[in-house]
Amino acid sequence: MKKGDVKKVVLAYSGGLDTSIILRWLQDEYDCEVVTFTADIGQGEELEPARQKAEMMGIKEIYIEDLREEFVRDYVFPMFRANTLYEGVYLLGTSIARPLIGKRLVEIAEATGADAVSHGATGKGNDQVRFELTAYALKPDIKIIAPWRTWDLHSRTKLIEYAMRHQIPVPKDKHGEAPYSMDANLLHISYEGKALENPWTEPSEDMFRLTVSPEAAPDKAQYIEVDFERGDAVAIDGEKLTPAALLAKLNEIGGRHGVGRLDLVENRYVGMKSRGVYETPGGTILQVAHRAVESLTLDREVMHLRDELMPRYAKLIYNGFWFAPERLMLQAAIDQTQQTVTGTARLKLYKGNVSVVGRKAAKSLYRMDYVTFEEDTVYDQHDAEGFIKLNALRLRLGKMARDS
């Protein structure tokens, strides 16, 4: 695209140095009007400075929105109904935030008459894919500007020089290279790059912001109860909470006990491996509690089938296909499994660990009168003989055929 191709663009704007440089670059490169959009998804930053900075740079249309409840209710909770893990360990804290931001970019573009959207994701990572797949799925004719793929500002020195040349304030801590990049929302904080690029190097303890070191966690365990209704958490220790408030409280409780740290090397959609370190205290507790309630309330075959689908579902979210028809199809099936998942999990938190110590449900499939080791009157053990012989029939016939 060149000057004149774009009249108005909506920029995903954090107020930080990089997106402020992008803002000015868009104005210079395309001679277009820029609308800024800043989302509060629980990153824990004051957002008013983003407004002030945008105003200082001449922006007239500024959108700053609190999306925390929508983020947890419509994105995090649906994902957690599947006990979703990417590559067996990652709770997808970054991946699940991108569809909501991308959706609002498109909606604001439509509301303001903008013909393009722009983001600050680099050309090496997954986020560019997630933002753009979302935008194209919701508005096929949208134009997308990804500055990191087109400009020549590929070093910190060049970025700083550009900022100073255009009177963009440069915080003192931005003059040097940051030891790592950080992304935060209500579900997690992720750390990548620089000091973490060597996968053999242990992260510095002072990097972590949500969790204490397990060694420094309290010497006394804490017990909590989490209530679920139809697969979604609704209360902690009997206190009803909104989705965002519930996750925030679990973050605080889990962080205090060193719960939810993860260090992994993952396979990016763009083809390379990357090392990331994550803090997901509330999400870790939520998943363990959810699985505990499911153990009482989900039919065996339903649970096993859902668990077989989960890796594909996780891959779709990781790769940016939240609004794809196959994800929506899987979501409908997952949501159907959760109609009976109502109950309570009791958990023990101690020095980085989350242990299930109790679970209950009004409509539990667990029957003590059937599983007791004491004498019972409801289960005829003679029935097992025919069950075993029928299941063994093909094994016996196979052996007989091989021996003949």
Swiss-Prot record:
Top class in the EC scheme: ligase
Organism superkingdom: Bacteria
GO molecular-function term, one example from the UniProt record: argininosuccinate synthase activity
Gene3D superfamilies found in the cross-reference section: Argininosuccinate synthetase, chain A, domain 2 (3.90.1260.10), HUPs (3.40.50.620), Single helix bin (1.20.5.470)
Subcellular localization, as worded in the UniProt entry: Cytoplasm
GO biological process: argininosuccinate metabolic process; L-arginine biosynthetic process; urea cycle
GO cellular component terms listed in the entry, alphabetical order: cytoplasm
Pathway assignment: Amino-acid biosynthesis; L-arginine biosynthesis; L-arginine from L-ornithine and carbamoyl phosphate: step 2/3
Positions annotated to bind L-citrulline: Y90, S95, N126, R130, S181, S190, E266, Y278
Pfam families attached to this UniProt entry: Arginosuc_syn_C, Arginosuc_synth
EC id: 6.3.4.5
Catalyzed reaction equations: L-citrulline + L-aspartate + ATP = 2-(N(omega)-L-arginino)succinate + AMP + diphosphate + H(+)
Residues annotated for ATP binding in this entry: A12, Y13, S14, G15, G16, L17, D18, T19, S20, A39, G120
UniProt keywords, alphabetically: Amino-acid biosynthesis, Arginine biosynthesis, ATP-binding, Cytoplasm, Ligase, Nucleotide-binding
Positions bound to L-aspartate: T122, N126, D127
PROSITE patterns per the UniProt record, alphabetical: ARGININOSUCCIN_SYN_1, ARGININOSUCCIN_SYN_2
Main subcellular location of this protein, as a coarse class: cytoplasm
Keyword presence, ATP-binding: yes
InterPro entries: Arginosuc_syn_C, Arginosuc_syn_N, Arginosuc_synth, Arginosuc_synth_CS, Arginosuc_synth_type_1_subfam, AS_cat/multimer_dom_body, Rossmann-like_a/b/a_fold
UniProt cross-references to CDD domains, sorted A to Z: ASS
Family named by the database record: Belongs to the argininosuccinate synthase family. Type 1 subfamily.
Quaternary structure and interacting proteins, as annotated: Homotetramer.
Record PANTHER family: ARGININOSUCCINATE SYNTHASE
HAMAP family reported for this sequence: Arg_succ_synth_type1 (MF_00005)
Protein name: Argininosuccinate synthase
Species this protein is from: Rhodospirillum rubrum (strain ATCC 11170 / ATH 1.1.1 / DSM 467 / LMG 4362 / NCIMB 8255 / S1)
Phylogenetic classification of the source organism: Bacteria, Pseudomonadati, Pseudomonadota, Alphaproteobacteria, Rhodospirillales
